[in-house]
Curated annotation (Swiss-Prot):
It comes from Coturnix japonica. The gene is HOXA7. The lineage of its organism: Eukaryota, Metazoa, Chordata, Craniata, Vertebrata. This is Homeobox protein Hox-A7. A motif (Antp-type hexapeptide) lies at residues 118-123. Central nervous system including forebrain. It holds the Pfam family Homeodomain.
Length: 242
């Protein structure tokens, strides 16, 4: 046997194994069943053209290990790869959708300059800002009136006790007593200038009568003094004329 026989036999085994490995490797679906690997160089194309039976998809050498046992041909592999290639972008889109939505939820839209929230403490307190009038309940007013009847001025300790008991602040109780004292002074000032009312107590009526009697007595005394002075002056004038 010549050396060329051994070389051809080895070359045929190598090329057949390479072709099977090339078709079985699922590296990329873009490679056809009869495509050439770029790593074999230009010589591989020459050998492949010289032996078309080994590289042909329809040849018996290629179909014997797969088609006999599994009844699968090149079309089945090509269809599987094409369907897988078509589903790749769909799967990628489905996988990236929730991540993109989560990223959008985590990054809320930044408000513009005119959309900032203004809190009450950020607003300026100008002269037009009016404070609401404090309204007291009937129970609070009754308790404060009772205390005012006995004490017109409250101490700090008593004010704190009433603030806790009536659910008010010390400032509110202080203002209420100030207003109540002014009202009381105004009422008593009007009473002193006018006659006593008939519905007042007997003691006040007695005091009023005594004051009237004293006033009349003083008027009488003043008149009597005046008359006595006039009489004495007349007597003196008569004596001087004589």
């Amino acid at each position: 046997m010549s050396s060329s026989y051994y070389v051809n036999a080895l070359f045929s085994k190598y090329t057949a194994g390479a072709s099977l490995f090339q078709n079985a490797e699922p590296t990329s679906c873009s490679f056809a069943s009869n495509s050439q690997r770029s790593g074999y160089g230009p010589g591989a194309g020459a050998f492949a053209s010289s032996m078309p039976g080994l590289y042909n998809v329809n040849s018996t050498i290629y179909q014997s290990p797969f088609s006999s046992g599994y009844s699968l041909g090149s079309d089945a592999y090509n269809l599987h790869c094409s369907s897988f290639d078509q589903n790749i972008p769909v799967l990628c889109n489905d996988l990236t959708k929730p991540s993109c939505e989560k990223a959008e939820e985590r990054q809320p839209a930044q408000p513009g300059r005119g959309q900032f929230r203004i809190y009450p403490w950020m607003r300026s307190s100008g002269p037009d800002r009016k404070r609401g009038r404090q309204t007291y309940t009937r129970y609070q007013t009754l308790e404060l009136e009772k205390e005012f009847h006995f004490n017109r001025y409250l101490t700090r300790r008593r004010r704190i006790e009433y603030a806790h008991a009536l659910c008010l602040t010390e400032r509110q109780i202080k203002i209420w007593f100030q207003n109540r004292r002014m009202k009381w002074k105004k009422e008593h000032k009007e009473e002193s200038s006018s006659t006593p009312a008939p519905n007042e107590s007997r003691q006040q009526q007695r005091l009023w009568r005594k004051w009237k009697k004293m006033k009349k007595r003083r008027i009488r005394e003043s008149h009597s003094r005046k008359q006595s002075l006039e009489i004495t002056y007349a007597r003196d004038s008569c004596k001087s004329s004589l």
